[in-house]
Amino acid sequence: MISRRHFLQASIASSFIFNSLGINNSSKVMAQQNISEKNLLDFKSFGNVSIMHITDIHGQLKPLYFREPDINLGVGNVLGKPPHITGKEFLKYFNIPVKSADAYSLSSEGFSSLAKTYGKMGGLDRIATVVKSIRSERPNALLLDGGDTWQGSYTALKTNGMDMVKAFNLLEVNAMTSHWEFTLGIERVMELVDNHLNFPFLGANIFDTEWDERAFEPYTFTEQNGKKIAIIGQAFPYMPIANPSWMFPGLSFGIREKNIQEIVNEVKSKNADLVVLLSHNGFDVDRQLATRTEGIDIIFCGHTHDALPIPIIENKTLLVASGSNGKFLSRIDLNVDKGIKDFKYRLIPIFSDVISSDKEMANLINEERKPFLSILKEEIGETDSVLYRRGNFNGTWDDLICNAIIDERGADIALSPGFRWGPSLIPGSKITIEDIYNATAMSYPKVYLTEMTGNTLKIILEDVADNLFNPDPYYQQGGDMVRVGGMGYKIDINKSQGNRISEMTMLKTGDRIEPEKKYKVGGWASVNENTEGPPVWELVEKYIRRKKIIQIEKNNSVKVITG
């Protein structure tokens, strides 16, 4: 494990903003604490290469609230290592004062109250301001997109990703990789890549199954201050497992460790001074990959939505985690001379009330949203609870979705996927149609209703649990744990596959779920092609309209054994 001293030495020039921050209830708290655009962007240029990174935007054009996880368990070699520490432990580990701006942006501690103080984060118009500011002093600074960009909002759904393509073209991104992009269907992906995207769509690990040839560009070269930079793209390796393979027939993915090493060797043979892996593997996969390959200087991580204030170092490789939903933009300046000699890093928090809106990007966003604005802004209810998704187990957004499935479809048990995307709502917020789509907008949304035996339910839970808690990161193949409604269970994350789940119980009666008994189960986002049922957003809208006020009780239905 890297020591805290090693962390601090590795990013000696890394710039946090919390040093002068306290907290009070004043509406002028930002000004009082000297949190200004100038303060947030203050960064003395360093070295000869500058790179910016954003990832997992999930279609979010506008500022939002996003609560970080309060539980993000690690197993095996990553137990107790970042990013598998949360809340107070996270703040203590990185020496971040409680109630500070950094505590709000990077942890779940006091989220609801701090959100009222520090406000929303993100917004591509604010990100555009940051990008332009950095490029004003470093004109050739690279901007890399880690993927999960074209999906996750109403406008992305209705435009089939075109709104995000336009926005990222305007940002002048230099390269991207992918995951959820392929749920638009391979034909749409190719249409956007071939006819609309102004920068490389990289996927060194995506192969044509018929010819066993690469289906996309594996890497691209660029130059900055005389230094040749190789950017290798690594798409999400488990697409056919986690998402519907019928949407992208003829393609295979995978980690392809040997393939990556061969490409690294290839770009080095072509005189690359710096080798960058733009990855959507997930942080733990990237950490292991760094220990099993040689010659990768930086991995820009994606998929798991982790936000870390400083890079992690594994086997001389820097791992950068830039969060999700537009909350952060990473900037790293490097002194490059046949590899990294030194670096300076900052995870820039995009506080929407502080960073000014870029007019050009704001105009584009307004134009993309204009045809749908009356729908997006329609208020259908209000929440008394914080609605969030991110975390290993049930979040309140998914509790709401499960409740809607049970009530509207007459199910005994509801299953909701362990997706990490979707903004949060703070207590007292109106719930709009846009909010529902932000938590559900995807291309296979149908809510099925079927019968499953207790045995089948256990197999499903065991399978997902192994995808999350297998001690070998290369077998961690999905999102967070499937969310459940109407039932509870106990999970021992350290046991082997098939032995983690026990004490499955019907919450309404307290009865144990019987292996051979059939139960009426509703769920959504099935990867099966012929799934029948209404779209999930339709059920959730009906449920909220009927309830009017949403109040989610604390969910204690999942008992987690970690020791």
PLM region spans:
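Secretory targeting signals
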Residues: 1-2
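Acidic, metal/ion-coordinating pockets
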Residues: 8-12, 18, 30-352, 360-361, ...
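Short amphipathic
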Residues: 344-346, 381, 449-451
